[in-house]
Structures are given as C-alpha cells and as structure tokens.
C-alpha cells in the first residue's frame, strides 16, 4: 500500500478549481472532553479548513497553528517545529524517518504515540495537497509502496490518488554525482562510492599481516616440539584415515581454482573495490588472529611422515648477533611470503597448526564467491562448496593438520564473515549505538562508513569494462595535470618569499632616505585595503613633499633599522600594528608642509 506502515490510505475530496477542501469528519482525530464536548487544544470542535494551494506558503507560525488545531500535541513538539524552522514547504517534504529523527537524533523528548500521530497528520496533509489541483507547487512527497524512499517533484508527475494495491509514483532523477543512474534508482537512491584510499588502506593492512604471519611461522618452526619426545596427539580422523601423500597438493590446487573464480568475479563486478576492501579486511583480521594462536601454544607434529626438527631453523651460531639473527629470520620469512606458504611453491613449514591457514583461505574464497554472485547460479555455488569441503578433506587426508585445527579455522572464518556482512547489510544495527561501534569495531566503522545496505550483484560487460578502464586512465591524467598546474603555477607566496622579493627594493629606498612611491607600489593593494585610494594619495604626497625641510616637531623621527623593520612587517602582514604605524607616518609627512607654512 502507498502509505507504508502508518495505516490505511486516506483519499481526500478534490476541488476542481483549487479552492478550499475540507477534511471529512471520519478522517479527523479529535480529543474531546466528555463533559464539555470541546476540543482540548483550542476549545473549537472544528479546525479551520486547509487551502492546499497555500500550504507551501505557510510560515512557521502557520505550521504551529495548524498542528495546534489538528491534534493535542505537546508544547515540546510545537517548540520543535519553531526551533527547527518547519515552514509549509518543509512540512510537505517531511518523511517518516524525519519525524522519527526528532526524537532519536535531535533529542526532543517526544513520546512514540505523539510522533505517530504527528506523522499521520502530516501524511494526511501531504495527500490532501497532492490530490488537489496545486500543480504549480513543487513538493517532495514520499512513495511508501516498495519500502524505498523515492522523492519526486509533484509538478511534473501528477501522481494520482493512492490505492490499496499500487502506488503510481514515478522514479526520481539521479543527482549529478551519480555515474550509473539505473543502479542508483534500483538501490533506492543509494550510491556506493569506490573509495580508492580505503581500498589501499585495507590492502596495506593485509600486506602487513601477511608479513607478520610469515615471521611468526619462522619463529614457531624454531620452537616445534621434538618428534621423538612428543609423538602425534590422538585424533579421531587422523587415526582412522590413512595418509595420502598427494592430498596436500590437491588441496592447494583446489584453492588455486577458487582463487581464479574469485578473480573473475572481481574483474566484472561493478563494485569490485568494495569487495576487495572487505576481502582484505577479513583476511587480514583472521590471519592476525592465527598468528596469536600459533605463537602461544606449540602442538606436536600431527604425522610421522613429516620431517620437522628445531635444528632445521635453529640459529645456534654464537658468532651471529641479534641483528644478524633478525636478518636470517627475515630472509626465511620472505621465502615463505613469496611462496604464499604453499607446498607446490616449495615452502615447507612446521609448527603452524592452530589453526589451519589453508582452511581459512578456502573458506573465505568460498563465502565471498557465494555472496557476491547472483543467487540463481546454483551450479557455481554448489561447485565452490564442493571445492571447499574437498579441500578440507585433502588437508586432513594429508595429515598436515589436526582435526581441531581445521574445525576452528572453518568456524572462525565463517562466523567472522557472517557477522561482518550482517552489520554491513543492516545499517540500523550499526547506527543504533554508533559510538560503541566505533570503539569495538574501529576498522569496520571506517571501511563501511559510506556503504548503506547490501551491495547489489551487478556486473560489467567486457566492453563497458574496457571503457571504464580508459575513462579512469584519462581521469587520472587530468587529475595529475590539475595537480601539477596547481603546485607549479598557483602556489601561494609565503611570508618569507614576499619579504625576500620586496626586501631588496625596500632596502634601496631606505638607503636613499626617502619613502618613494616605487617602494610602496608592490603593497598598494595591501595598504589600499585599509585606506582605499586615500592611502595611495598620502604616499604620493609624501614623495612630492620629501624635498621640503620638515621641522623636528612635525613628524616623529625613527632610526633606519626601525623604519626598515616597519616596512618589512607591512609587506608580510598588512593588518599588523606596524602597517598602521607606516600609514600614520605617511599622513604626518603629508601634513608637514602645511604645518611648516603655518609656522613661517
């Protein structure tokens, strides 16, 4: 229905000539005293009729009077209308969310029932004006048919009376900053900016975490328990499944296939930067947690086929100092980092058991592919889940991890993914207590601050993708040219540079003992702002009267360093005290010939 969650639609009588339209008695809500049968607000049982042609021209007092006559509203609500400057035009463009914000964002102490009654009154007034012949009034009236807030101008629409099943409200026009108008309208007026800087920040965060993980794997390999003293722990799955030598390589091939699918999804998805930002943030967080669990507890080697020993990575050379040991560990960490920790890349590590990094990678790729592909791609979703499960099975069949390692990795990764996207897709959960969200989830609050709701799964064609790449290249070139021009041609002059530019000329004038107009010419615009054309005349007069002898009492004399400092300060700061002193001195110099003549 057309009026959303408020109630049944209300159809008002329409005037052919745009005259007065009086609301029906059934649609009017009164608060009557049983004893006196009078209206509790103004003592009149019938409010004045409303002219829909004049509602948009109401002043703040007219709106307050209308609210007083319509319902028994509290003084707090009336004060809110006055303080927030709600006039007729603003009243007609109010939405249910705006009315709700009076209590939850603006902080007015209004009851829930009063807010609902005020919104019902506003909605009735909006429908009354919309159904009248006031076609020359541009209004922002909300269509509540599909749950999306779509605002449209009434003059160009002529949206008819609301019905119980349909709401013939037209679509709004896109703002100028939206490049994809169809996506903007399908998202209900929401726009998802790419935010390159935030994506770069998430990439940097993930990059740092991968280096920390590699260094942690080097350290835990040095602390791996001795296989002779600490045999493999009892495990239900490992004790009943024989060792398959090629299984771990198959697990990594499975992960590579999932990664290839994810790269294809990223390439053609319209909001690829949002997906990248979320992937890097979640992957970095999970692997950072894995560094803690690997380091605090060292489990014994899960299989006897693994050749793991502390001597392989131990640094026992007494000639190696702390810096040398750090360099050796960093070189080993680089080998792990460059090989992505994969055995098919020649990387062999021990001790990094709790929890499984391969399971984390498989689960993250599976969940991201499933989330950001259309729901009707059942074959793709089934394939990714099969690859995920078979990858986990291959890890256990290779006896490279305990069962608890795989289970904890799958649980933590899946829960973190679901919690993150639950908060991101439901904006109200994050905005209900924004301060606490920023404290407990600072990275989430930063990365998702401009994303409102679910990201639609929309894809670019190959042609549009190429056009977008070319457009981004030209846009980057234009931005670079503008930045170079701004830095090279439009660089503002600092105080030191201006003093350096005009300092030589001022020193020349001071050595000549005259305050010539040429000295002041670079600063006429500065001093002219203080005295206009008058100050320029004074300076020129000072030049013409410089040859006339001036009595000692006509103008105060200053030493050469004082004058030099005064003019330097005037060039740097035209509003300093020394600038006014220089102007006053010039006026005294101008008046000195008249005083001398009078003295003679």
Curated annotation (Swiss-Prot):
Membrane topology: Multi-pass membrane protein
Transmembrane segments: 200-220, 246-266, 279-299, 349-369, 377-397, 404-424
Annotated Low complexity bias: 541-562
Record region (Disordered): 1-21, 530-572
Catalytic activity from the UniProt record: an N-acylsphinganine + a 1,2-diacyl-sn-glycero-3-phosphoethanolamine = an N-acylsphinganine-1-phosphoethanolamine + a 1,2-diacyl-sn-glycerol; N-hexadecanoylsphinganine + a 1,2-diacyl-sn-glycero-3-phosphoethanolamine = N-hexadecanoyl-sphinganine-1-phosphoethanolamine + a 1,2-diacyl-sn-glycerol; an N-acyl-(4R)-4-hydroxysphinganine + a 1,2-diacyl-sn-glycero-3-phosphoethanolamine = an N-acyl-(4R)-4-hydroxysphinganine-1-phosphoethanolamine + a 1,2-diacyl-sn-glycerol; N-hexadecanoyl-(4R)-hydroxysphinganine + a 1,2-diacyl-sn-glycero-3-phosphoethanolamine = N-hexadecanoyl-(4R)-hydroxysphinganine-1-phosphoethanolamine + a 1,2-diacyl-sn-glycerol
Coiled-coil region list: none
Residues recorded as bearing Phosphothreonine in the entry: 514, 548
Active site: 358, 401, 405
Cytoplasmic-facing ranges: 425-600
Protein origin, superkingdom: Eukaryota
Known role: A phosphatidylethanolamine (PE)/ceramide ethanolamine phosphotransferase that catalyzes the synthesis of ceramide phosphoethanolamines (CPE), a class of lipids that is a sphingomyelin analog and a major membrane constituent in Drosophila. Transfers the head group from PE (1,2-diacyl-sn-glycero-3-phosphoethanolamine) on to different ceramides such as N-acylsphinganine (dihydroceramide) and N-acyl-(4R)-hydroxysphinganine (phytoceramide) to form N-acyl-sphinganine-1-phosphoethanolamine and N-acyl-(4R)-hydroxysphinganine-1-phosphoethanolamine, respectively.
Domain notes: The SAM domain is required to retain SMSR in the endoplasmic reticulum.
Protein name, as recorded: Ceramide phosphoethanolamine synthase
Species of origin: Drosophila melanogaster
């Amino acid at each position: 229905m057309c009026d959303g969650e408020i109630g049944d639609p209300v159809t008002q009588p329409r005037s052919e000539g745009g005259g007065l339209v009086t609301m029906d008695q059934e649609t009017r809500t009164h608060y009557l005293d049983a004893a006196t049968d009078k209206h509790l607000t103004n003592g009149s049982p019938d409010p004045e009729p409303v002219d829909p042609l004049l509602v948009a021209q109401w002043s703040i007092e007219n709106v307050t009077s209308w609210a007083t006559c319509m319902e028994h509203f509290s003084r707090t609500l009336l004060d809110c209308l006055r303080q927030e400057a709600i006039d007729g035009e603003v009243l007609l463009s109010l939405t249910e969310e705006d009315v709700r914000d009076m209590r939850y964002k603006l902080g007015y102490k209004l009851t829930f029932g009063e807010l609902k009654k005020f919104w019902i009154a506003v909605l009735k007034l909006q429908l009354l004006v919309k159904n009248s012949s006031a076609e020359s009034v541009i209004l922002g009236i909300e269509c509540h048919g599909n749950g999306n807030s779509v605002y449209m101008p009434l003059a160009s629409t002529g949206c008819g009376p609301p019905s119980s099943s349909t709401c013939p409200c037209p679509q709004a026009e896109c703002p100028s900053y939206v490049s994809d108008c169809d996506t903007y309208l399908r998202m209900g007026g929401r726009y998802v900016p790419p935010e390159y800087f935030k994506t770069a920040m998430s990439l940097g965060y993930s990059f740092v975490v991968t280096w920390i993980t590699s260094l942690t794997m080097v350290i835990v390999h040095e602390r791996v328990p001795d296989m002779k003293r600490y045999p493999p722990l009892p495990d239900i799955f490992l004790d009943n499944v024989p060792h398959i030598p090629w299984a771990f390589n198959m697990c990594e091939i499975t992960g590579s296939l999932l990664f290839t699918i994810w790269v294809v999804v990223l390439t053609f998805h319209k909001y690829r930067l949002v997906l990248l930002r979320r992937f890097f943030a979640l992957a970095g967080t999970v692997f950072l947690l894995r560094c803690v669990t690997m380091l605090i507890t060292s489990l014994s080697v899960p299989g006897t086929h693994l050749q793991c020993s502390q001597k392989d990575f131990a640094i026992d050379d007494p000639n190696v100092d702390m810096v040398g040991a750090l360099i050796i560990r960093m070189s080993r960490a680089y080998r792990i980092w460059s090989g992505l920790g994969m055995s098919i890349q020649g990387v062999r590590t021990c001790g990094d058991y709790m929890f499984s990094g391969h399971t984390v990678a498989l689960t993250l790729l599976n969940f991201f592919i499933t989330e950001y592909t259309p729901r009707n791609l059942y074959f793709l979703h089934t394939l990714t889940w099969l690859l995920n499960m078979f990858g986990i099975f291959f890890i256990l069949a290779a006896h490279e991890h305990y069962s608890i390692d795989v289970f904890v990795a799958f649980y933590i990764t899946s829960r973190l993914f679901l919690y993150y996207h639950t908060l991101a897709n439901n904006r109200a959960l994050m905005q209900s207590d924004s301060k606490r969200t920023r404290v407990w989830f600072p990275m989430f609050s930063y990365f998702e601050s401009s994303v409102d709701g679910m990201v639609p799964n929309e894809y670019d064609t190959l042609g549009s993708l190429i056009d977008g790449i070319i457009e981004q290249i030209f846009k980057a070139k234009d931005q670079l040219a503008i930045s170079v021009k701004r830095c090279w041609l439009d660089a503002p002059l600092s105080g030191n540079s201006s003093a350096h530019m005009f300092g030589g000329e001022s020193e020349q004038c001071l050595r000549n003992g005259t305050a010539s107009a040429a000295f002041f010419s670079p600063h006429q615009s500065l001093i002219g702002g203080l005295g206009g054309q008058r100050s320029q005349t004074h300076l020129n007069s000072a030049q013409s009267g410089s040859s006339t002898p001036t009595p000692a009492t006509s103008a105060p004399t200053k030493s050469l360093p004082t004058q030099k400092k005064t003019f330097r300060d005037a060039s740097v700061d035209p509003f300093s005290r020394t600038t006014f002193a220089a102007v006053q001195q010039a006026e005294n110099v101008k008046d000195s010939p008249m005083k001398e003549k009078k003295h003679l």
